[in-house]
Amino acid sequence: MSTRLGMDDTEQIYVRPANSKYIKYGRPRNDILLRVIENKDEEVKKDIGNIPFWIMRQAGRYLPEYMEIRKKYSFIEICNNPELSSEVSIMPFKRFGCDMVVIFSDILIIFVAMGIDLKFVDNIGPILNKEIYNMNDFQKLNVDVKKVINNMYYVYDSINITKGKLNNDVPILGFVGSPFTLFTYLTKNNKKTYEHSLKFIYEHKTDTHTILNVLSNICINHLINQIDSGANVIQIFDSNADIVSKNMYKEFSLYYLKKVINIVKKNRPDVFIILFIKDNFHEDIKNLHIDVLSITHKQLEEKTSSFYYNLFQNKIIIQGALDPHILLIDDMNLVQKYTSKMLDQIVHKNKYIANLGHGILPNSKIDNVHAFIQTIRGVKNRLPLESG
């Protein structure tokens, strides 16, 4: 594998000196989500209590209060302003009492730190001002880890500010896109599909691995600096895992996920790691040093929760997996029924975090979110329905 650009499989950890100025906090007051994750290696019958929940993209366009902020500021302007980002991050907690606050940011912020202008266009998505067709294009970007991390200071400031505003009430989630998902966005070249990304992989296999290695080192350092800023839990989003075959996924994603996870765990062993792999599966995920596996509604229906628990020998927490489209419907009672059906499919409720199968949609109804939460709150996670 090529190691040009000075990147290889060795650790290259950079911690911002400014991190030492952050206030250090202890364990959050509401630690139900952390206690569930800590139950990963315990017997399945251990009683935890309520089922914890949070919602992917829980601070977003479905919230009226967020849309008021958006009248004044763009998405990127909010991300770049630690005070605004913190304010938006807390909105869902104030409204719904979520068991974890997600810092308001985006997986593509890394590209901005690498020297790419990024904008989000409604109904289109992210637009990058630079296109990557070959290695020469990539080498023009800023790939120096120290510079990239320092350029993302506002993410780390926002995490620490949010922790203070919350009085350390609940855990904070930091996150990153997987190296593979970042690669696909980087080489998508603003097209609707990922044909350019796949073409790049087939045409420039060695260069693909070089780029993935660079992105892995940036991801590792971004996660470690989020943890040092106050994140209790981190999630890795492999949101584009479904665009490649099982074997390609193993080569171009799992290898780099393992690298990121192992190095983060080695350097910050107390952090909990959630992995979200969208609609792809390879049995080698069982060898990843993760605490939580976040699944989609499709994965829950196709494989069942028992399959995933058994794959990890019951030493895993499952997260998910309501279809986000259910929160668009006009009947709260139906939302509750679908949520109950989902909960019935989770065999070990004391090894479970309730969530959606993917990010909440912009047109989701607030009442439906309440119905989703109320249904979850009505179920205890004491005993499995069946031994999986």
What do these predicted regions represent?
Residues 262-386:
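Catalytic-face loop-and-helix region of soluble metabolic enzyme cores
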Residues 119-222:
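Active-site-proximal, glycine-rich beta->alpha crossover segments in alpha/beta enzymes
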Residues 151-170, 246-271, 312-315, 372-381:
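Alpha-helix-loop-beta-strand connector modules within alpha/beta enzyme cores
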Residues 4-122, 259, 344, 366-385:
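N-terminal basic, low-complexity leaders that serve as flexible interaction/assembly modules and, when applicable
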Residues 44-51, 96-100, 166-172, 230-232, ...:
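Short, well-ordered coil/turn segments that N-cap beta-strands
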Residues 188-234, 239, 246, 250-272, ...:
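Alpha/beta enzyme core
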Residues 102-122, 128-132, 138-148, 230-250, ...:
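Glycine-rich, proline-tolerant flexible connector loops at the mouths of alpha/beta enzymes
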Residues 52, 93, 162, 219, ...:
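Conserved, mostly hydrophobic/aromatic
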